């Protein structure tokens, strides 16, 4: 199957059209982005197949929006996406060279971040070495002096812009996404070197740590599918593609062979799960399906260690943010399961030696997607709506409505005040993943 590229001339903005529904449907047929699926029977990636998104579900929701048949939840998610993309249009392109701290290498092209839960020791005159306070975020790790927040922000903007282009057809969004990608990865003056040698450093202990590999997860979960989607845009050049392939190839080598990467590969908690997602997602982009198989097998060994018989995750329950980390670990496992499906490996139904499984882990957490149901463990936060996209993907994979009760009653409201501000981003992401980037049974009715 060949793919069709969207025209580079400005397309219709579905927010402003006031055309008959039937005509709008005909317009859509000529503007839909057609991206082929993987040749699953052969276990081969096909150029253009997404890693974590579904082409058919994206097309379904794009068409429902254009024909004024989308659910109110889908419309809300779409409007929020455009708002985020419009804000991104006004932002300057970001680069690792923007930071004020110079890494030990002497090059600002090397990524640098500070570990969030480490603080100066107030018992020491120089504060060194820093000490760990689990769950308490040091503001010094979240400012522009280092790259941690910058990387998360940059990848979120690229993802929003690329999706906004896909759903609206407006070329300005793709142009900005491409510009941001070139600035971060390609342009010699601003590019990031393909390593995380100085990620999640702790003053007085280490300039960088294996746990810092986690920072790069967004390269897989946000950038990979954006790159695949942008292949359909003629402004994304063959040279762009070649240089991104080279960057990702070098970064994947670093992930697999650096001391930090090897340490993260051996991690038994959520870090190990995210390592598999990161390697597998980038390998998928580079058309290396065997690497995906290897990461699926590696995740099985993680689940064997992580999951108790009833589906709880004792390593994550021991944390001060036990709900967050139980969800966070499970999020990585479900993403890996989605990608493993494309190489004919069923991680959803895989059983650990003690009879547990990814589904049992979801079963264990599902009731707490309702935030009125008290999470019975110590936890500094409980944002249950995060679980909803995971349950949607599980139901799709299982071919049943196992979690429909929880999906239907999901609370996507945002309250006012400080707590509402914290919740807004979580709700926006969960709503998008559930209603715009996926198709629920309610949408198929």
PLM regions: where:
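N-terminal secretory signal peptides that target proteins for export/translocation
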Residues: 1-19
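Generic detector of N-terminal low-structure segments
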Residues: 14-16, 32, 39
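Bacterial N-terminal signal peptides
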Residues: 23-36
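Extracellular glycan-targeting catalytic surfaces
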Residues: 41-261, 297, 341-342, 351-445
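Active-site-adjacent structural elements in folded domains
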Residues: 144-145, 234, 238, 256-267, ...
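An alpha-helical repeat/solenoid feature that recognizes helix-turn-helix modules
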Residues: 212-219, 272-273, 326-329
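Loop-centered beta-sheet repeat module
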Residues: 247-283, 289
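Long, repeat-rich segments with strong aromatic
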Residues: 277-376
């Amino acid at each position: 199957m060949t793919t069709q590229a969207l025209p580079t001339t400005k397309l219709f903005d579905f927010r402003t059209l006031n055309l008959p529904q039937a005509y709008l449907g005909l317009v859509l047929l000529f503007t839909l982005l057609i991206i082929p699926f993987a040749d699953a029977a052969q276990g081969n990636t096909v150029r253009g197949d997404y890693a974590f998104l579904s082409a058919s579900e994206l097309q379904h929701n794009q068409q429902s929006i254009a024909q004024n048949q989308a659910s109110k939840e889908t419309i809300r998610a779409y409007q929020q996406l455009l708002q985020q993309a419009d804000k991104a249009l006004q932002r300057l392109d970001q680069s690792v060279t923007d930071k004020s701290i110079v890494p030990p290498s002497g090059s600002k092209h090397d990524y640098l971040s500070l570990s969030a839960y480490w603080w100066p020791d107030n018992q020491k005159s120089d504060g060194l070495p820093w000490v760990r306070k689990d769950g308490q975020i040091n503001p010094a790790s979240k400012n522009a002096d280092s790259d941690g927040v910058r990387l998360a922000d940059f990848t979120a903007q690229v993802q929003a812009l690329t999706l906004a282009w896909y759903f609206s057809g407006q070329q300005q969004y793709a142009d900005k996404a491409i510009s941001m990608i070139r600035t971060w990865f390609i342009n010699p003056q601003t590019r990031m070197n393909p390593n995380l040698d100085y990620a999640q450093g702790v003053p007085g202990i280490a300039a960088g740590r294996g746990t810092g590999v986690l920072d790069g997860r967004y390269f897989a979960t946000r950038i990979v599918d954006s790159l695949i989607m942008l292949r359909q845009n003629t402004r994304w050049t063959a040279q762009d593609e070649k240089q991104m392939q080279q960057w990702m190839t070098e970064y994947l080598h670093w992930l697999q062979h650096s001391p930090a990467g090897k340490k993260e590969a051996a991690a038994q908690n959520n870090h190990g799960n995210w390592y598999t997602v990161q390697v597998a997602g980038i390998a998928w982009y580079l058309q290396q399906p065997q690497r995906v198989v290897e990461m699926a097998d590696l995740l099985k060994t993680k689940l064997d260690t992580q999951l108790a018989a009833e589906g709880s995750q004792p390593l994550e329950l021991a944390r001060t943010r036990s709900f967050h980390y139980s969800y966070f670990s499970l999020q990585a496992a479900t993403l890996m399961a989605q990608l493993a499906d494309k190489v004919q490996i069923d991680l959803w139904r895989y059983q650990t030696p003690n009879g547990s499984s990814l589904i049992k882990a979801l079963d264990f957490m599902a009731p707490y997607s309702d935030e009125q149901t008290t999470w019975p463990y110590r936890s500094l936060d409980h944002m249950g709506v995060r679980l909803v996209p995971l349950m949607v993907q599980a139901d799709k994979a299982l071919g049943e409505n196992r979690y429909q009760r929880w999906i239907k009653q999901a609370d996507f409201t945002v309250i006012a005040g400080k707590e509402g501000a914290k919740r807004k981003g979580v709700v926006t992401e969960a709503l998008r993943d559930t209603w715009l980037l996926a198709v629920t049974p309610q949408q198929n009715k």
